[in-house]
Amino acid sequence: DLRMSRGLGDVYKRQEKMMDKNAIKKFAVWARTELIARVSLKGVEYGITEDNIEDANADSVGGKVLTADEKKQRQALIAEINDKGYKQVMEEVAYTWFNRFSALRFMEVNGYLPSHVRVFTDEENSFKPQIITEAIHLDLDGLDVEKVYELKDAEKTEELYKYLLIVQCNALNKILPGMFQRLSDYTELLLPDNLLREGSVIQQMIELIPEDDWKDAVQIIGWLYQYYNSEKKDDVFAALKKNVKITKENIPAATQLFTPDWIVRYMVENSLGRLWLEGHPDVKSQLLPTEEEQSAYSTGNRDPEDTKWHYYLEETEQEPEVQVQLAEIRKEYAALTPDQLKVIDPCSGSGHILAYMFDVLMKIYESYGYTTREAVASIVENNLYGLDIDDRAAQLAYFAVMMKARQYDRRFFSRGIQPHVYAIAESNYVDKFAVDYFCNGDMKLTAAMDTIISELHDAKEYGSILTVTPQDWSALYDRFAEIKEDIHISRGAALRGLLPLVQTAETLAQKYDTVVTNPPYMGSAGMNSKLYDFVKEEYPDVKSDMSTVCMRKTISMCNEHGYMAMINIPVWMFISSYGKLRTEIITRNSLVQMLHLSLIH
């Protein structure tokens, strides 16, 4: 059922509640430059510039005597700069605060903050942070009320605000550890000054981006992220023209692209949605629109309560022998229950596809008779998986899934459930003592960890195209549970360094019923030598572009009768170098639908 479709995207564009993308882009591009400048200025205050760093053990800098905390934070910052370089650290601190500001704004607008106190605005959305006026009444973990009184009495409003902001971020670590990690000492040290002034990053975020754009639309986080990176992406490609290859650190900026909403809906509905409906045709009336509903949707008269699958395409009539084969496959689908489904976006970016997979899974669970609360918990625990090489993107994808869960279940944050959405971890700097402690002389654990460590070396270079050996995952997780309350000196290093490796390995090793993704696009000319050599060795038939490498890989991630849906460069259909890929797809797999985007205007 191959369709060369024209104008399908226009259907969605006519009815979509349009975000002000120009405002979002204007803010995000400006915010990156502004935040890097502001955190760098804080560095100067502590005797740290790109060209010079004053003594790490100094008790005072520029005539200012350092507190014990400031001295410790400054030493941590200097150590990080010595390890990663000045520019990289300033970039990381800037985007850390950008991510947090964006997440806090989304949560306050949607009423998701557990404190129910706005961080940036008052109830009328004016730039008068409610958290300041309610400071002495706040119920936040870690809040020093005496310090609050002290700062209020001294009328140090800016200092009070920075303190409350840090306490709020650290308090959210309890429910959103994947987004609000405990702030590194130096990250806190470099929080910009004058956040309450006219023209600050926070004030501009409130003024430039309409409040409605944040409401029930977690994809705004993805747009912010893409636009924030746009200048860096331009720099990477400008360097590429001068034959400077794309480094491991710059692969995310060079390859990530936010997927338009209608394309996400089309891919997810016709893969995950199709798999379910083919096994459970009796619920079609619950999940698919009537002709009248589809007509209204297409003309822009959309009911906000309408969550049916408007991009689902019914199959055309098949040949008799094909119908026999499909009947056998559909028996397998019919035996599936919602909690058995496993779906993944292996190049998840900021989580747009994962967020819509969540919506589609909710409809599936509801049609099967689950309560909303049961469905949300099961989706997060059993169904949904996401991976990305970029820590920032994975953080935002994690946040998107958690916000979806909170949207459906207002008490979700209290349930202690965390999603399977991870930044791909690499094993380059594993602590040998932590490995020895974790394995504890157990030969099976030792063999498993040795294999995982070997296979995930330089994993951030290769991402989800790595092939990982299945292990006894239960035994590994049982050991993590065992050491959780241990007091051994290596316990922390094992949990911090080894658990992410095991989570990454398991996610890469298992098979899925549906794989949906928008892969990275990078021609072989842009690959650095290490990545190119790996691709040439492991994926020789599709080595010309990372997107076709991902095409081959995602097919192998599917169960025997699973679905893969992805966007890709059209040349794989035509040029001779992709002949083997075409033959493999035709002989070993089945094409259900194809949408040629070049025909869409």
What are these regions (language model features)?
Residues G7, S60, L140, L176, ...:
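Intrinsically disordered, low-complexity segments enriched in small/polar residues
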Residues K13-V283, M402-V421, E426:
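Non-catalytic, mostly N-terminal accessory regions of nucleic-acid modification and defense proteins
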Residues V592-I600:
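RNase H-like polynucleotidyl transferase catalytic core
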Residues D1-Q15:
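Single conserved hydrophobic/aromatic residue that forms the stacking wall/gate
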Residues D10-Y12, V145, D303, L466:
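Polar low-complexity intrinsically disordered regions enriched in Ser/Thr and small residues
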Residues K242-E249, A253-Q593:
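SAM-dependent methyltransferase catalytic region
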